């Protein structure tokens, strides 16, 4: 789903047929692409399934989904936090992971977030400004925001959503695709590790809060012309694939999520989607039947503002930036020069020893990737002629100039042909200047769910 200008004729909605990607096709789609994923444990599973699918056509195991903060997962590397720091369930928990393929043509990085906007997010944006520019950013933060930051959490969430979209609009280059994942539906009983025992009474209203938070985040993302993938809609009937904790999902759900995400990305980049002759998937077929019955009872997309009695968004003014008590030093120069176009991410230098500290001088944009999978990708489509923005890597995309294939969802708005955002180029990106006192290791406690 995307938001764009008014008075644009809607494209024909496709049926609920699902596109399935093989590993070789994912390798081609993300060839020479830098993918950044930010969010909670759900987004960590999104990262893990994408890393796995970049290497082989298998599903995650239950133990891989359950593991958190491990030193290595499927040839990736834990860069910071997790087992390198202290395992706890506090809002200062950090975990940074990175996967670089053996060929050096795929780079995927994950940052664990406990709040959609914070000083830590500004640190992340500053780190990204020193390395290659991301080609794809996938982000969500909702459950922690609505359950761990006081009684006015929804108001704070809205303010922080506006902050993060403004900053992403300023920092990311024009060529970067940002996809905001809406939070997935919760179960009636929520026992995820992010919800402390003393906060269990909040679980009663958290399901409704997530729907309301999704409404605000989709609206604000649309205001900034960012793409939105409505996972709440797509997984509303997948109850049996949700874990007993009411929050997390099994490996089949996450592979389905990966296919939805990759289809959205391929369509946004104008890539011809693969066509496979395959037997129907009973799991997907069950969803299709429920989707049709849902659509039959709503000739038009439902008005969720009326159903949820949500107020219209008033004119919103960005709160003043956070202030800090001492003067700031100028930002240090990057440790590595920008990558030339079509250069693999792997440069052969060893990964520097990394102690988990907030230090702008420490950069892990281009680590040695270690042993990788020596797979041979399929034939690549011809590269596309035209300018490539600074720091970007030309991949094997096929621009067809065809209408977007948008799946049915309550927020459908068609995408116009050209870009609707006008952001600063990579070389002119704004770097956050106010800094908070750098913390060392995160506080001790229990492991997050």
Curated annotation (Swiss-Prot):
Q: Which residues form the signal peptide?
A: none
Superkingdom in the source lineage: Eukaryota
Q: Which family does it belong to?
A: Belongs to the PC-esterase family.
Which named protein is this? PC-esterase domain-containing protein 1A
* Species whose genome carries this gene: Mus musculus (Mouse)
- Classification of source organism: Eukaryota, Metazoa, Chordata, Craniata, Vertebrata
């Amino acid at each position: 789903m995307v938001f764009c200008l008014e008075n644009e004729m809607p494209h024909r909605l496709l049926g609920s047929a699902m596109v399935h990607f093989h590993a070789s096709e994912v390798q081609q789609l993300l060839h020479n692409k830098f993918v950044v994923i930010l969010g909670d444990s759900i987004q960590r599973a999104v990262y893990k399934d994408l890393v796995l699918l970049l290497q082989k056509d298998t599903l995650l195991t239950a133990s891989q989904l359950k593991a958190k903060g491990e030193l290595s997962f499927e040839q990736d590397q834990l860069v910071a936090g997790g087992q390198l720091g202290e395992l706890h369930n506090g809002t200062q928990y950090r975990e940074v992971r990175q996967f670089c393929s053996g060929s050096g043509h795929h780079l995927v990085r994950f940052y664990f977030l406990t709040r959609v906007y914070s000083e830590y997010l500004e640190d992340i944006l500053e780190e990204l400004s020193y390395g290659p520019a991301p080609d794809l950013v996938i982000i969500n933060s909702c459950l922690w925001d609505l359950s761990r930051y006081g009684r006015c959490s929804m108001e704070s969430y809205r303010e922080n959503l506006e902050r993060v979209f403004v900053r992403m609009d300023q920092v990311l280059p024009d060529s970067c695709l940002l996809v905001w994942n809406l939070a997935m539906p919760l179960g009636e009983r929520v026992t995820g590790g992010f919800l402390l025992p003393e906060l269990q009474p909040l679980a009663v209203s958290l399901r409704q809060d997530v729907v309301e938070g999704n409404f605000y985040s989709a609206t604000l993302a649309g205001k900034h012309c960012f793409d939105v993938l409505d996972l709440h809609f797509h997984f509303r009937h997948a109850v049996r694939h949700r874990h007993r904790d009411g929050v997390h999902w099994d490996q089949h759900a996450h592979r389905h999520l990966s296919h939805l995400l990759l289809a959205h990305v391929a369509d946004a980049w104008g890539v011809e989607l693969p066509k496979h002759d395959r037997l129907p998937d009973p799991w997907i077929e069950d969803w299709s039947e429920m989707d049709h019955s849902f659509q039959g009872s709503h000739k038009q997309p439902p008005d969720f503002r009326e159903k949820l009695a949500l107020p219209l968004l008033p004119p919103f003014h960005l709160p003043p930036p956070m202030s800090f008590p001492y003067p700031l030093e100028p930002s240090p120069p990057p440790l590595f020069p920008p990558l030339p176009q079509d250069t693999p991410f792997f440069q052969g230098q060893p990964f520097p020893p990394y102690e988990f500290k907030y230090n702008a001088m420490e950069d892990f944009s281009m680590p040695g990737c270690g042993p990788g999978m020596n797979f041979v990708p399929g034939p690549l489509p011809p590269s596309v002629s035209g300018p490539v923005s600074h720091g970007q890597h030309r991949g094997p995309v096929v621009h067809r100039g065809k209408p977007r294939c948008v799946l049915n969802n309550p927020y459908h708005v068609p995408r116009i042909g050209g870009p609707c955002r006008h952001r600063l180029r990579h070389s002119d990106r704004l770097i956050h200047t106010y800094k908070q006192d750098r913390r060392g290791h995160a506080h001790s406690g229990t492991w997050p769910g």
